[in-house]
Structure formats: C-alpha cells, structure tokens
C-alpha cells in the first residue's frame, strides 16, 4: 500500500488511474513495458495493473489476521489458492485497488509440459507475474528458513 490507507496508492478516486496503471481501458489487450506510468509513493512502478503479482500468501476469504496487519503474511502449506494482487491489463478498476486479492488456480499452469509441473510456469495466465524483492535488513537464519521452506509440495499428475 506504500504507506497509504486509500483505495489506490494515489488516492480514492479512479480518475487518476490512467496515470498510474495499465488496465482494461488503456492497455490494448496486452501487458505493457514497465515504468511508463507514475510510481507509487515508494517509487515502485506498475503496482496497480499491467500484470498482477503472485504472492506467497495463502488466500483466505476472511483476508489477513488483524493482529498481523503491520506486515501481513498468510502463511500456509497448500499450493492453492495463493494470492495475486494489483490487478492486470485485463482487469477493471476495482481489481486494481490496493486491498484487492485474487485466489490462484491450478488451471493457470495447465499447459506446463514439465513433469513434475513447475510452480512458476504460467502460460495460461499471461496477466500474472511476480516481483523480486529483498528486505532492507538481512533476515535471521530462522526467518529465511520459515520463508523458503514452507513445506509446499509440487503439483501432481492429476
């Protein structure tokens, strides 16, 4: 949310959305080169629209635990559904709101030719990507272990 409490990082009105996001009204039915729209207050581009970002969060209809809203992470061991955020070039403005979340689906990867299926092969979700991030401070070994060794298993041949 880039430190904001509004619907979008630039305010509550959709009127400025064209300045900050690629979405169904302006993207010409495809993702666009990054960095062409205005950044959020933290200087990050394309946080609304263009491609939705697949996160490590487990999807829950209830949302995040109110006790962990400072730095929320809904950790889980299941591969599906995870959370996609930010909306995409193929979405309407409501899906680009800072709080909007979309549950992932196994069908996003159905054309993956690899066995076992890759957790990152997404030819059926061309509106989805991920953002590489790093913390400002190197996490402890215990924290790294909890992040990268979640116990999630790969897809099976179902």
Residue ranges and their predicted role:
Residues 4-13, 27-30, 47-157:
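Surface-exposed recognition segments
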Residues 14-18:
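Short, surface-exposed glycine/acidic/tryptophan-bearing loops
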Residues 37-40:
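Short, small/polar residue-rich loop motifs at catalytic or cofactor-binding pockets
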Residues 42-45:
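His/acidic/aromatic-lined binding-pocket segments of jelly-roll/cupin-type domains
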């Amino acid at each position: 949310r880039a430190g904001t409490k509004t619907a979008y990082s630039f305010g509550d009105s959709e009127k400025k959305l064209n300045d900050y996001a690629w979405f169904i009204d302006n993207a010409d039915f495809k993702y666009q080169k990054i960095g062409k729209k205005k950044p959020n207050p933290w200087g990050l581009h394309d946080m609304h629209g263009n491609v939705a970002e697949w996160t490590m969060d487990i999807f829950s209809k209830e949302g995040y635990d109110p006790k962990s809203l400072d730095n929320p992470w809904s950790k889980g061991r299941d591969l599906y559904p995870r959370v996609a955020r930010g909306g995409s070039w193929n979405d309407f403005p409501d899906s680009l709101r800072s709080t909007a979340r979309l549950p992932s689906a196994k069908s996003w990867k159905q054309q993956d030719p690899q066995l076992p299926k890759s957790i990152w092969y997404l030819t059926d979700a061309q509106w989805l990507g991920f953002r590489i991030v790093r913390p400002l401070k190197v996490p402890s070994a215990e924290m790294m272990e909890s992040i990268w060794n979640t116990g999630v298993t790969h897809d099976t041949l179902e």
